[in-house]
From Swiss-Prot:
One of its GO terms (cellular component) is cytosol. One of several proteins that assist in the late maturation steps of the functional core of the 30S ribosomal subunit. Associates with free 30S ribosomal subunits (but not with 30S subunits that are part of 70S ribosomes or polysomes). Required for efficient processing of 16S rRNA. May interact with the 5'-terminal helix region of 16S rRNA. The gene is rbfA. InterPro entries: KH_dom-like_a/b, RbfA, RbfA_dom_sf. This is Ribosome-binding factor A. The keyword Cytoplasm applies. Its main location: cytoplasm. It comes from Novosphingobium aromaticivorans (strain ATCC 700278 / DSM 12444 / CCUG 56034 / CIP 105152 / NBRC 16084 / F199).
Amino acid sequence: MAKQQTSPETRSVRLLKVGEQVRHILSELLARQEVHDDVLSAHTVSVTEVRMSPDLRHATVFIKALLGEDEDLVLKALRTNTAFFQREVAQRLRLKYAARLKFLADESFDVASKIETLLADPKVQRDLRDQESDG
């Protein structure tokens, strides 16, 4: 029997959908404190994004420790408990393969904050006003 071909659009939608499901599962596990770790119990952790590899075997999980406290410590605790998270995700999703999770700090908030600071700078504001009056 021939293998069914999927279009790139279908594949990308599936990656997004599975990534979002993984994000919800991990968020729920952390919110309910189902992992028994003192560091994770003491911190509020937000799972901001999950990016799946095209074969769904690897998931990069971006997290943000709320209030920016001890993010390195939280990442270390998450990495220590990776096996627990992988097992829970595999049991709840029932995919062909259990995705290997890789936890990283989400730095997009820091980048956005820097951009906002730059845009609030008086010199930049002046340049923006000059461009509007020229256009």
